[in-house]
C-alpha cells in the first residue's frame, strides 16, 4: 500500500504522538519537504531537535517532541495565497489571531505566513500548526 500524502501522514503522526505524551516520533518515509517543514517547526519552537536516519529505504526522521503542539496538519488542497490574503486562511485554520502559524511554500523557500507577509511574497499553503 502506498501513501497518498507523506506530509499529511507525517504531521498526523506528530500530532498523535504529542497528544499521547510521547517524547520521540519516528517519521517515515522521509522527504526533503518533510525535512523543511520540520526545520520551520524547530525554528519556531514547536519541536526539539530532529535528525535524518538512513535505513536503506526511504529514510526516517527522528523528532524530539517538547509538548508545544496542540494540533498540526497538512492543508489540502494546497491553496495559492497572495501576500495580502493570509488573514482569510488564518481564520480558517488557526484558532485565534496571533496564535499558531501557517507554513507557506514561496519562491524564496518554506517560511511562516508572518515571514511571507513581511517579505511581501505569496505562495501555496502547506500546513498549519498551533
Swiss-Prot record:
Pfam families: Ribosomal_S8
One CC-aspect GO term: ribosome
PROSITE patterns for this protein: RIBOSOMAL_S8 (PS00053)
Keyword Ribosomal protein attached: yes
One GO BP: translation
Keyword hit for RNA-binding: yes
Residue intervals passing through the bilayer: none
Keywords of the record: Ribonucleoprotein, Ribosomal protein, RNA-binding, rRNA-binding
Record-linked InterPro entries: Ribosomal_uS8, Ribosomal_uS8_CS, Ribosomal_uS8_sf
Disulphides: none
Molecular-function GO terms, alphabetical: rRNA binding; structural constituent of ribosome
Quaternary organization: Part of the 30S ribosomal subunit.
Protein purpose: One of the primary rRNA binding proteins, it binds directly to 16S rRNA central domain where it helps coordinate assembly of the platform of the 30S subunit.
Family membership: Belongs to the universal ribosomal protein uS8 family.
Protein's UniProt name: Small ribosomal subunit protein uS8
Organism: Methanococcus maripaludis (strain C7 / ATCC BAA-1331)
Lineage: Archaea, Methanobacteriati, Methanobacteriota, Methanomada group, Methanococci
Gene for this chain: rps8
Amino acid at each position: 500500500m502506498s501513501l497518498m500524502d507523506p506530509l499529511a501522514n507525517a504531521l498526523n503522526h506528530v500530532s498523535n504522538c504529542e497528544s499521547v505524551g510521547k517524547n520521540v516520533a519516528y517519521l517515515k518515509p522521509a522527504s526533503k519537504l518533510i525535512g523543511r517543514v520540520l526545520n520551520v517547526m524547530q525554528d519556531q519552537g514547536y519541536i526539539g531537535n530532529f535528525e535524518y536516519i538512513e535505513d536503506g529505504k526511504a529514510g526516517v526522521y527522528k523528532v524530539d517532541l517538547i509538548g508545544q503542539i496542540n494540533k498540526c496538519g497538512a492543508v489540502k488542497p494546497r491553496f495559492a495565497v497572495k501576500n495580502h490574503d493570509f488573514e482569510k486562511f488564518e481564520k480558517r485554520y488557526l484558532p485565534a489571531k496571533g496564535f499558531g502559524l501557517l507554513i507557506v511554500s514561496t519562491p524564496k523557500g518554506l517560511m511562516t505566513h508572518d515571514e511571507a507577509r513581511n517579505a511581501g511574497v505569496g505562495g501555496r499553503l502547506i500546513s498549519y500548526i498551533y
